[in-house]
Structure formats: C-alpha cells, structure tokens
Curated annotation (Swiss-Prot):
PANTHER family: 1-DEOXY-D-XYLULOSE 5-PHOSPHATE REDUCTOISOMERASE, 1-DEOXY-D-XYLULOSE 5-PHOSPHATE REDUCTOISOMERASE, CHLOROPLASTIC. GO terms for biological process: isopentenyl diphosphate biosynthetic process, methylerythritol 4-phosphate pathway involved in terpenoid biosynthetic process. This is 1-deoxy-D-xylulose 5-phosphate reductoisomerase. GO terms for molecular function: 1-deoxy-D-xylulose-5-phosphate reductoisomerase activity; manganese ion binding; NADPH binding. The gene is dxr. Keywords: Isoprene biosynthesis, Manganese, Metal-binding, NADP, Oxidoreductase. The lineage of its organism: Bacteria, Pseudomonadati, Pseudomonadota, Gammaproteobacteria, Alteromonadales. Belongs to the DXR family. HAMAP family: DXP_reductoisom. Pathway: Isoprenoid biosynthesis; isopentenyl diphosphate biosynthesis via DXP pathway; isopentenyl diphosphate from 1-deoxy-D-xylulose 5-phosphate: step 1/6. It comes from the Bacteria. It is an enzyme of class 1 (oxidoreductase). 1-deoxy-D-xylulose 5-phosphate binds at residues 124, 150-151, 185, 208, 221, 226-227, 230. NADPH binds at residues 10-13, 38, 123, 125, 214.
Amino acid sequence: MQSLVILGATGSIGASTLNVVKCNHEQYRVFALVANTNVAKMLEICIEHRPLVAHMVNAQAATELKRLLPSELAIEVTTGEDELLSLVSCAEVDTVMAAIVGAAGLPSTLAAVKAGKRVLLANKESLVMSGQLFIEAMQSSGATVLPVDSEHNAIFQCLSERTQLEIGRCDLAGAGISHILLTGSGGPFLNSELSTLSSMTPAQACKHPNWSMGQKISVDSASMMNKGLEYIEARWLFNASAEQLKVVIHPQSVIHSMVQYRDGSVIAQLGNPDMRTPIAHCMSFPQRISSGVEPLDFFKVGQLSFLEPDFNRFPCLALAIEACKQGQEATTVLNAANEISVQAFLEGQIRFTDIAIINEQSFKHVTAQSLTTIDDIMALDSQARQYALEAVNKLK
C-alpha cells in the first residue's frame, strides 16, 4: 500500500487525486493532506479520508482547523515551512502529489525530490523556475518524477520504456524521435475577434470549453501562457531542444499530445479531458488502475481538427517560447510576472490583454546573474513580482 502526501489537497488536482484514491482505496493510504487557507474544504476531506496529518500553510487556518476537527479522528494539524518540508521528506511517505499552484509549490516539491520520493508533478512552475537544479536534484537523489499535466503525461506514455526511465536526460534523437507535438485547445477565445479580447472578463476567461480547472490555470489557458509554461516544462522533462518541440492547437482536447518518430510514425495518447486519467496513470505506473473516467466514445467525438498557433492572438505563448530559448533566468521572471498579472486580471485591476503587456515588460527589464541555488531563484522571483506589481499599478 502506497503512503501518499497531497500538496494542494483542496484544489482541482487534489480533488481529482482523492477521487482516484477512493476508487482504489485498497492500494493507497492518505498520509497527509496539505492546503493553504481553505479550512472548510480541508475539514471535509479530512473527515472523509482520515489522513494522519493535515498541514495548513496559513497558521490562522491551522488553528481554526484544529478547533473544528473531531478529536476522535486523532489527526495531527501542523503549520510552518519547516514542518511542511519535513512532512514531504518523512520516511513513512512513498509518494508526493505536487499540486500546489505557482511558485509557492517549488520549495516543497523540490524537498520531495531531494528526499528521493516518487513525485507526481502537477506543479509545472517548479520546472519552469528551477529547471536544471530540479533535474540535478532528481538525478542525485534517485527520485522518480512522473508528469501529471495531461500533455506531458501523454508524451510520457508515447515514449519507449527505456526513454521513460531517462526523464530529465532523455536522448530523443537516439530514441528515433524527431518532434514532440504539444497540443492545446486554444481556450475559450480561440475564435473570438481580436478586437474583443481587451474587454473579456475573468468569468469568460475561466469558462474553458473542455476542461474543469482552477481560476489561474483557466486564465493561463485563455492566454495560452499555460501552453507556454508546458513548453518550458517539456524542455526539461524530456531534454528537448527548441527544434524538437512544436505546439499544435487541437480544439477538441481529445489528443493530449503526440510524439513524431523519424520513420514517419506519430504516436498519440487520446482520452476524455479529465485529469483523473493522467493522475491514475502516475499513481500506478507502470501498472494501470481505475480512474473513474468514462472511456472515450469515438462515435461521439466525430472529428479531430488541428491549427497552427497564431502568435498575434496568443502573445504569451510566443513570450514563453522565447524565454525558454534564453534560459532559466528568463523563464523564472516570466513565470513570476504572469502570476502577478493573472491575479490582477482576476481581481478586475487590468484588462485581459494587459497580461501579455505586463509579462513582456517584466521579461525585458528584470535581469539576473546565473541562478545556482534555490535562494537565487526565489530572489529573482521576488524581484520580478515587484516589477510586475508596479506595472499593474501603472495600468490601473
């Protein structure tokens, strides 16, 4: 029985993970649940899943949870950064679902990697920010990292067994691979008039045509920054060059990504757009378990279509690709700026089209020396956030 820690337990990925656990309760034990401030949701899932530990990042939320939890459950409530890092490194823990959104998830995800855990990586920002440091930590500790993002999980499933064992140091050309084809739906504004994008609301941006996701990733999907971050993540996970990575718009979200081989073959992974499928795959790899997802009905799908991305419509995607070419400093800055600009948009402070403007300004103006430690990364992240906040204030 695997002992599981879920980072970001009250979020969308956390809920899907617990759903898969429920379908396979004889194989998994929830050792700990980790959340930030959502006490009501944490209380609900603690009562249902009975973890040994419930960790709240917010100290006030931890106090409130401790007060509300029935004492007979004997769940230990903890808070604090050191306690969280100790929790993911605990000898009793086998697997860590890394699903805290954004830069906030980097320290705990990296701690799990350094502890040699089986890490189910849903926090793409960890690789976007720490890249080489992350890969080096994984190789040094012997940690197993499995990609949860549907696209990267699809790519992983399309690789040979040998290449699957070489995450972070894959030799794609040696495996006969010519291109990784990263698919994306194009989001809710794919067919909107360009002139209307500046007036799009947070509610419209969060109404994804195919996926049910949290607010931040929904806005990122609307701008295709999410695909840009996934492009950067794919670069590190699969040791891919810019020439080996291509983005393909696929509005139906049925093909989750593809791998093109030298001999002309293209292998694709298909399925209904439901995160429980890649989560179940990662949790059980190399075996297969039930995810609770309905099988794909090809007769209902009807057609599959593909488009080249329009960078005039999706400038954030172009920025991310350029940042990936420039290196770690650029991707760290872009990620930080995007978190600030998206939050400002969600709060009604800026227009949807201002997200790309702020991201580009930050990308061009915030610079740093080489990043050799996690402290270097977090310092640059903080610097980029401050610049982006100032840019937001100028646009209000």
